């Protein structure tokens, strides 16, 4: 009888682990923290704001394209358009972000900024989750390339 009870209990536990998430659960294709992590880098590393240092057009690496409500984070990003009409020098001004990689300490994000032809820098930024928000500790972004 004990063996049967133990077998039934372990079967129920294993079955619960194998149950897929409910349809209204979080999406599996991305992380709901991505927008907040990117916004933290934009505000704290690049010092973008809505008044005197407005963000450059934003672009993402590869097929990564999170849908974010940037105004929620006090930012006003416009999407990068390489075919934008007008001054061609404006088409080489952008900030880009790769998909955040999460670990036990927070997230790491590859990011870069181009201010114009041959005037850009790449970084790898460590972002940590604080009590109220994601933050970029002082010195947590290291240069990865310069043009």
Labelled PLM ranges:
Residues 1-17:
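Sec-dependent bacterial lipoprotein signal peptides
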Residues 5-8, 86-91, 125:
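Residue-level signal for the start and early helices of compact helical domains
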Residues 17-121, 140-147:
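Flexible low-complexity loop/turn motifs enriched in small/helix-breaking residues
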Residues 124-133:
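Short beta-strand segments and strand-loop junctions that repeat across beta-rich extracellular domains
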